[in-house]
Amino acid sequence: SKQTFHADIVILAMGSEAGKLSGMNESRYHILKQLQLKVIEPLPSLVQFYTSPVLKVLKGVRVKGTFSLMENDKCIHQEKGELLFTDYGVSGIAVMQLSSFYKKHHQYQLYIDFFDELSHNQLCQYLSQQSSLFLEGMLNHKIASYFQKYQDLPIQKLAFLLKHYRLDIQGIREAQYAQVMKGGLSLEDVTYDLELKRYPSMFAIGEILNVAGMCGGYNLHFALASAYRVAQAIERNVYVKNS
């Protein structure tokens, strides 16, 4: 509306694009930059991965195991939990947790351990007893059917494949599919009370700040806790001003 308003206290509570069907709208970050504040590039977090290959034959199949985000043979982060195969890549809580560690312009791989409760040798022993019943009863039947093409591999190699199945990560899904955005107003620009150092009596709360937690309600908690922190600071300031 281009109207001008005057206020004693301003709170920046603009949120983010996470979960919004309208896609990316960086006007909130443009406002911060106009105020000469440091903005960390926003990026979807707690979001699904695009992968190669895409295992469309397993679409809708969930699997429990241990999942590792790798780069150059180095484990960036590992999650134990559940993964969901989709028609674009992978989803599930474990995948969303791993996405928190994703950075642009990096080449990541996702390694799936379908048998994380068994050591390599224990799995070899189980496989040697399967003979004609290849993986039947050991994995979801669709996953077992998918791995049928590897049944002629030596048991040692097959066991390794099942404990280190690799998918190349092609990227993360867009902001509209994310639960939260990482990036935003740098914490270097705010005080302990979330007051802008450059602009006294201006505060920032919630997802506009460069704070992003893991799954489990941590981001909702931060939104509420940051609002409470600012409310306390404002109350103190008003009390001091009026005393």
Predicted regions, residues:
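Glycine-centered tight beta-turn/hairpin loop motif at sheet-sheet or coil-to-beta transitions
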Residues: 1-2, 74
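Short hydrophobic core segments
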Residues: 4-23, 32-33, 83-88, 202-204, ...
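Glycine-rich loop(s) and the adjacent beta-strand/alpha-helix scaffold that form part
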Residues: 9-55
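Glycine-rich phosphate/pyrophosphate-binding beta-alpha loops
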Residues: 19, 48-49, 91-93, 180, ...
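A conserved FAD-binding loop/helix module that cradles the flavin
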Residues: 20-31, 35, 196, 210-239
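An anion/pyrophosphate-binding glycine-rich loop and adjacent beta-alpha core
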Residues: 37-43, 47-155
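Conserved mid-domain beta->alpha element of the FAD-binding
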Residues: 100-104, 124, 131, 201-203, ...
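A glycine-rich dinucleotide-binding beta-alpha-beta segment and adjacent secondary-structure elements
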Residues: 145-212
